[in-house]
């Protein structure tokens, strides 16, 4: 099973759109979209990873 990943190299961003495309993080939290998730990844110093696309 290949690990699912998201390219967060363009982040953090100061503001995210309201677009709803949920992702489930390794913290079992559902993030509203890639921007929200990637900002959290940056804040976690890379410890947060993607569990899967869609709600947790």
From Swiss-Prot:
InterPro entries listed in its UniProt record: Bifunctional_prot_inhibitor, Kazal_dom, Kazal_dom_sf, Prot_inh_Kazal-m
The keyword Glycoprotein is assigned to this record: yes
Main localization, broad class: secreted
GO molecular function, a single term: serine-type endopeptidase inhibitor activity
Domain Kazal-like residue range list: 6-56
Residues linked to a glycan: 45
Subcellular compartments: Secreted
Disulphide-bridged cysteine pairs: 8-38, 16-35, 24-56
Coiled coil regions in record: none
Keyword Repeat: yes
Gene Ontology cellular component terms for the protein in this record: extracellular region
Keywords: Disulfide bond, Glycoprotein, Protease inhibitor, Repeat, Secreted, Serine protease inhibitor
Site residues, Reactive bond 3: 18-19
Gene3D superfamilies from the UniProt entry: 3.30.60.30
Domain characteristics, as noted in the entry: Avian ovomucoid consists of three homologous, tandem Kazal family inhibitory domains.
Official protein name in the record: Ovomucoid
